Each structure stands twice: as structure tokens, then as C-alpha cells.
Amino acid sequence: MTERTLVLIKPDGVQRQLVGEIIGRIERKGLTLVALELRHVSQDLAAQHYAEHEGKPFFASLLEFITSGPVVAAIVEGPRAIAAFRQLAGGTDPVEKAIPGTIRGDFGLETQFNLVHGSDSVESAKREIGLWFPDA
């Protein structure tokens, strides 16, 4: 089943010049980039994107990090795109859970600075794509 997912290359991935490597892995997996944009994230967009974490102790640091530098936002499409990208990304803890061969396993340094975000469900993908690409 063809799906769409939101992929973010977070500020640490942009700063470490891993954008080309990450996009290359997405394309080699057979997924298609249907929208791509480099942007600075506003506090408002960050708060909406991470709304499910509001009230948690790490919420403020999430917002601070995602707004700390440019982010590459992309809509990625393909068969089972959500699961396919999450497999490419690897576990959220790059040291303990992300295996070598995944983006986080190969390049991640710590849990908060884990390079990429990918939607975790069809519902999340629709909501997140609507936030980041309202005209899509």
C-alpha cells in the first residue's frame, strides 16, 4: 500500500552535513521524495509538532533543539513508507537501540540529537504533513 510520511532531518543532521547521505538512503530504499524544504522552525510549529509531549519534563528541550537551526522537511512516498523509513532511521536511542546500518546507528550520538524524525502512523503522518506542508 502506498503511503506518505513526514521525514525531518533535524538540526544536528543538517549541521553535521548528513543531508545528502540521509536523502540517498531514502532514495536507495525505493522511496520517493514528493516535497522537500529547508526551513527554520518557529516556536509555534515546534509546539504543534510535539504537542503530544506537552507537559513532559523534556518538552522545552525538544522545542529548543528543533528550533536551534535549519531543518530539512520532506514528504516521502512509497509502499509502506512509514515503516520503511522508521526501519531506515533505527531506534530512537542511537547508542543502545539503533543497530549499525541504520541512520541513527551509523551517525547518531545521543537520544535527543538523533538526526531524523519519521511519522509513526498513518494518522500522525496526515497530521504532521498538514502542519509542515499545508498545501500538500
Curated annotation (Swiss-Prot):
Subunit description:
Homotetramer.
GO CC terms for this protein? cytoplasm
Classification from the root reads: Bacteria, Bacillati, Actinomycetota, Actinomycetes, Mycobacteriales
Q: Where does the protein end up?
A: Cytoplasm
Organism domain of life: Bacteria
Q: Name one GO biological process term.
A: GTP biosynthetic process
Question: Any idea which positions bind ATP?
Answer: K10, F58, R86, T92, R104, N114
This enzyme catalyses:
a 2'-deoxyribonucleoside 5'-diphosphate + ATP = a 2'-deoxyribonucleoside 5'-triphosphate + ADP; a ribonucleoside 5'-diphosphate + ATP = a ribonucleoside 5'-triphosphate + ADP
What cofactor is needed? Mg(2+)
Do the record's keywords include Transferase?
Answer: yes
NCBIfam families, A to Z: PRK00668.1
GO terms for MF: ATP binding; metal ion binding; nucleoside diphosphate kinase activity
Indicate what this protein is called per its UniProt record.
Answer: Nucleoside diphosphate kinase
Give the EC number(s) under which this enzyme is classified.
Answer: 2.7.4.6
Q: Which family is it part of? A: Belongs to the NDK family.
Q: What class of enzyme is it?
A: transferase
